[in-house]
Every structure is written in structure tokens, then in C-alpha cells.
């Protein structure tokens, strides 16, 4: 078993749906978790498919919620965005960018390959200080409410297995292979260093 609590980060594009659903579930299971986005702005589905609503990362979830409530309560209730923002507000004040975080993690889960690439590139561009390893694992999760929930439960299962592991470094590859077979998903995995 790990001698200390597993430190987990979950990263998606905007830190609104996929990473926050995983944050919510992992937190409820008592895991040490933070969540992030990687883009320069938060983009939410707008009233039309090609017209997203764009916010700065400094905008709180409550401010986004109130803005969308004023703009079109029915539309944003129907598409689930108001529900998501309400949940997010109960977890933390607002979205955070991964590139601005200086905390160390044991495992970082990303929700799509472009986010994985951004996280790995960012970690590799930082000056190495402690040479502590961090495992970066990508799991493709579609940006829908249902897929975010399913992905969050799979991330949670992996984290719980890692928490019980005698040696995470030795057991992670085997665990990922087992999860790939069980879930029918493939994972990208690499190790970076702080």
C-alpha cells in the first residue's frame, strides 16, 4: 500500500464537465484530487452548435451560472449546463488552468489526447526540481454528461486500485492493461518528472 495519500489531478479542456465530474466522484471517495483545464478560455455549448459561450478562466462558476441564467434559462437548463455549473460551484469557486499549477501529483488523468499532449509538453518544459515521477494517463472521454460520469467511475476504480497497490510503479502497467480489457478502452501512459 502507498505510504501516503495518492495525489491525483484530472484534466480536460475547460475544467467544466469531464474533469469536474471525476473531481466530484473522487472527492466523495475520499481521494486527494484537483481538476484543471488546458485551453486559454472556457468554452461552453451555446444556443447554436457553432456559437460557444466563452469565458476567461478567472470567471467563477457562479458568475457563469448567473450569466447563462440571464441569457437563456430554458436553453441552458435543457442542455444541462446550469446543472453542471451548480455542481462545480459546490466543489470549488472556478476553473483552473493546469499550466498555472505548481503542485505535484502522483497521477494525472487526461480526458482526450490533445489535453494529454498539452499536459506532457507542459511538464517536460518545466525545470526538473525533485525528479519525482508523475504518471500521465489519457483516457478518451466524450464531452457528454453520460460519458463524463462513466469515465469518472473508471478513473475512480483505477485510483482505488493504485491506493491498494504495494508498488504503484510496478503495478500500474498491468492495472491499465486489465482496465483496457474490462472497459474496452485503450489508454496512453507516460512518466514525466518534477
Curated annotation (Swiss-Prot):
Disulfide bonds: none annotated. Pfam families: Ssu72 (PF04722). InterPro entries: Ptyr_pPase_sf (IPR036196), RNA_pol_II_suA (IPR006811). Its EC number is 3.1.3.16. One of its GO terms (cellular component) is mRNA cleavage and polyadenylation specificity factor complex. Coiled coil: none annotated. It is an enzyme of class 3 (hydrolase). Its main location: nucleus. Keywords: Hydrolase, mRNA processing, Nucleus, Protein phosphatase. GO terms for biological process: mRNA processing; termination of RNA polymerase II transcription. One of its GO terms (molecular function) is RNA polymerase II CTD heptapeptide repeat phosphatase activity. It catalyses: O-phospho-L-seryl-[protein] + H2O = L-seryl-[protein] + phosphate; O-phospho-L-threonyl-[protein] + H2O = L-threonyl-[protein] + phosphate. It comes from the Eukaryota. It is found in: Nucleus. PANTHER family: RNA POLYMERASE II SUBUNIT A C-TERMINAL DOMAIN PHOSPHATASE. Protein phosphatase that catalyzes the dephosphorylation of the C-terminal domain of RNA polymerase II. Plays a role in RNA processing and termination. Belongs to the SSU72 phosphatase family. This is RNA polymerase II subunit A C-terminal domain phosphatase SSU72 like protein 2. The lineage of its organism: Eukaryota, Metazoa, Chordata, Craniata, Vertebrata. The gene is SSU72L2.
Amino acid at each position: 500500500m502507498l505510504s501516503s495519500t495518492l495525489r491525483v489531478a484530472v484534466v480536460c479542456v475547460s475544467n467544466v464537465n469531464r474533469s469536474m465530474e471525476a473531481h466530484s466522484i473522487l472527492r466523495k471517495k475520499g481521494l486527494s484530487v484537483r481538476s484543471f483545464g488546458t485551453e486559454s478560455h472556457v468554452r461552453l455549448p451555446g444556443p447554436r452548435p457553432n456559437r460557444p459561450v466563452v469565458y476567461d478562466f478567472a470567471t467563477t462558476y457562479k458568475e457563469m451560472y448567473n450569466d447563462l441564467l440571464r441569457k437563456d434559462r430554458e436553453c441552458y437548463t435543457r442542455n444541462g449546463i446550469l446543472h453542471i455549473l451548480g455542481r462545480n460551484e459546490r466543489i470549488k469557486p472556478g476553473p483552473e488552468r493546469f499550466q498555472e499549477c505548481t503542485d505535484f501529483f502522483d497521477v494525472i488523468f487526461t480526458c482526450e489526447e490533445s489535453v494529454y499532449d498539452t499536459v506532457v509538453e507542459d511538464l517536460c518544459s518545466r525545470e526538473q526540481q525533485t525528479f519525482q515521477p508523475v504518471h500521465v494517463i489519457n483516457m478518451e472521454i466524450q464531452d457528454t454528461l453520460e460519458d463524463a460520469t462513466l469515465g469518472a467511475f473508471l478513473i475512480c476504480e483505477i485510483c482505488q486500485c493504485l491506493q491498494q497497490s504495494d508498488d504503484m510503479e510496478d503495478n500500474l502497467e498491468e492495472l491499465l492493461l486489465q482496465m483496457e480489457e474490462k472497459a474496452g478502452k485503450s489508454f496512453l501512459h507516460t512518466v514525466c518528472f518534477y
